[in-house]
Design a protein with these regions (language model features):
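Conserved small/polar residues in nucleotide/adenosyl-binding loops
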Residues: 1, 293-300
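Gly/Ser/Thr-rich active-site cleft segment
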Residues: 27, 64-202
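Short acidic-glycine loop/turn motifs at beta-strand connectors
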Residues: 27-31, 119-122, 232-236, 255
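Catalytic phosphate/nucleotide-handling subdomain of diverse soluble enzymes
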Residues: 203-281
């Protein structure tokens, strides 16, 4: 696969990526994941944390409680609840668990922001273009409170988060915005032109909604490991209303110029996989071992 070349590289004008979210990773000053640096190769906490990791439940509850006590509820755009699947829950859990990680982590990057950074040759957080869809739905970014919640909020939660907050890009960009062009290094690797435009990263389900032709008056369901239900609404029809129970209500997400809504079930395909394993337990643990033993006995007799 590494040796394959595009038969018509001149036909490729742009590349855009979407990933699961929140899928954050601790990085060094050059935006390199710590897992790609010496001494962290086998440390799972230095790798990207998969979106469906729910280890940070305690941190999720702390953040939700702090939001509820504040003058501004910074979880109001996620149904007044901040999930353990989301950015700050995971980052807080990682940093609390390791003094070494706290020392070596310069910043934290979402996977959907990191891949465009790699492709464009971005090596500094101040140059990174942060995608609105992930920042708004997973990282508590909102224009109404000037970006991310203020330092006072995070200081009240745990001061360990303050250096990470200060290094996050303040501005966010929609998925219709270029992040840059293909770097010389990656142009050579891929056999493509350096003029290929790299799009700002997006959340996977949001891209699926766009691909399905989402528009005002429709609902799109993305069914897989999870089940995500999405809709969009013109902002003039919404006003200041917040929809209770929506996982993410973000101005400008999914479709630029619209209010994007995201909700659903964290476990969908995973539940079916669990149910299959449950039903198949007798086959795996009883029938198959017996059949295997019976087969081996026949083979042994034949050998004798």
């Amino acid at each position: 696969i590494r040796d394959r070349q595009c038969p018509a590289p001149e036909a490729i004008r742009a590349i855009a990526v979407d990933t699961t979210a929140s899928t954050p990773c601790l990085v060094d000053r050059t935006c390199t994941p710590l897992s790609l640096t010496a001494g962290y190769e086998e440390n799972p906490d230095a790798m990207f944390v998969l979106w469906k990791d729910h280890t940070a439940q305690r941190e999720s509850e702390e953040i939700t409680a702090l939001c509820a006590r504040g003058e501004i509820n910074y979880a109001r755009r996620s149904g007044n609840h901040y999930s353990s699947e989301c950015f700050w829950s995971k980052v807080l859990h990682l940093l609390r668990g390791s003094e070494r990680l706290r020392r070596d982590a310069w910043a934290v990057v979402e996977l959907c922001d990191w891949i465009p950074a790699v492709l464009t040759g971005c090596r500094a957080m101040e140059d990174l273009r942060s995608g609105l869809c992930a920042a708004g739905s997973k990282v508590m970014w909102a224009e109404e409170w000037g970006g991310y919640p203020p330092e006072e909020f995070f200081a009240g939660l745990d001061p360990v988060l303050l250096p990470i907050l200060r290094r996050l890009p303040v501005r966010t960009y929609g998925c219709d915005t270029p992040a840059g062009t293909l770097s010389p290094e990656w142009a050579a690797k891929l056999g493509l032109s350096e003029q290929v435009v790299i799009g700002v990263g997006n959340v996977d389900c949001h891209s699926g909604a766009v691909g399905a032709g989402i528009c005002h008056g429709t609902v799109v369901l993305n069914l897989g490991t999870s089940a995500c239900y999405m809709a969009v609404m013109p902002p003039e029809k919404m006003g200041d209303r917040m929809v209770e129970g929506i996982f993410g209500q973000v101005d400008g997400s999914i479709l630029p110029g619209m209010v994007g809504f995201e909700a659903g079930m964290s476990a969908f395909g995973d539940v079916y996989a669990w149910f299959k394993r449950l039903l198949c337990w007798p086959l795996r643990e009883v029938l198959l071992p017996v059949s295997y033993t019976h087969l081996r006995a026949h083979e042994t007799c034949a050998d004798l």
